[in-house]
C-alpha cells in the first residue's frame, strides 16, 4: 500500500441528513485516515479515547478539525472526495465547507473534489474561490439507457403495458432535455 498519498470519501444522502452532521462527516474522514496506518500517535490516541467514552460527547467539531489538520500535514498528497454535497442540509453544508477550507489550508498537498447540483455553486465558490467547475449534463441517450435499464430490471414486468413503457421512454427524455 502506498503511504505517500491518501484518498478519503463521503457520500451525502438526502435520507440520512440527520446523521450526516458536519461532526459525523469529518469524523468519518478522520476515521478513514486513521485506519490506513502511518498516522501520528496523538491522532490515533485521541480518536481511540473518544470512541471509549460511553455517554460522553466524544470528539467535537473543533477537535476533529485540529486533528485532521495535524494528520494531513504528515501526508504529501490528500484527495478529499465528497459526492452529492447538495444532499446535505444547508446548515451542515456551510459548516462542512468552512471546515474543509480550514483543513486544506494546512497542507499544500490537499485537494478537494466535490459533486453536487448547480444550485450550490455559489456556496462552494464562497469558500473555495479558485474552484474549477466542470458541468456534467446527461445526453438524451444517457437518459434513455438509464430508463431502459430500470424498466428492464422491474421486479413486476406485468405491472406495465407496452404503451406505458413507450410513453415513459418518450416523455421523460423530452422533459429532461427542456430543463
Would you name each region that the model predicts?
Residues 1-179:
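Conserved NB-ARC/NACHT P-loop NTPase core of NLR-like innate immune receptors
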